[in-house]
Amino acid sequence: MRALSVGVSPTAAVDTTVYTCPRGYYSKFTVMYIHNTGGSTKHITVQWFDASANSTLDILTQYDFTSKNYLQFDGNAYIVLEEGDKLKITTQSASSFSFIATFEEIGLTRQ
C-alpha cells in the first residue's frame, strides 16, 4: 500500500481531473478537503468517473461554500476506485478553491 495526497487549485469553471487510478491498482479515496479561498460564496461539484461502467456519479453537486469556508470528509468510510477511475471537480466561474484528496493505492490483488 502506498499513501498519496494530491492537491490542486483548479481553474474556475473548468472540468479538472484531480486523480486517475493507475493501471494495475485500485485506490481507496479516504480524505477530501475543500476550501473556498475567494471573497464570495461559490459552489463546487465533485465527481467520481467509473471507467468500467463509463459513468459519472456526483459526490457533491454544486455545493455552496461561503468565503473562506472549508469542508472536510474523512473517517471510517471510503470510496474504492479501480483502474482508470477518476476523481474530478468543477468550480463555479470566478471562484477560487483549493482541493486536497488522499488515496491509498494498492496492487490489484486485494488483501
Task: Place the predicted regions along the sequence by residue.
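Beta-strand-rich interaction surfaces with strong enrichment in secreted/lumenal proteins
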Residues: 60-63, 76-78, 88
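C-terminal interaction-tip segments
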Residues: 1-37, 83, 90-111
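A generic structural signal for well-ordered coil/turn residues at beta-strand boundaries
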Residues: 23-24, 28, 59, 67, ...
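Solvent-exposed, conformationally flexible loop/turn segments
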Residues: 11-16, 65-71
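Short, surface-exposed beta-strand/strand-loop-strand elements in extracellular ectodomains
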Residues: 39-62
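Beta-sandwich interaction modules
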Residues: 69-84
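Short conserved beta-strand and strand-loop elements enriched in small hydrophobics
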Residues: 47, 87-88
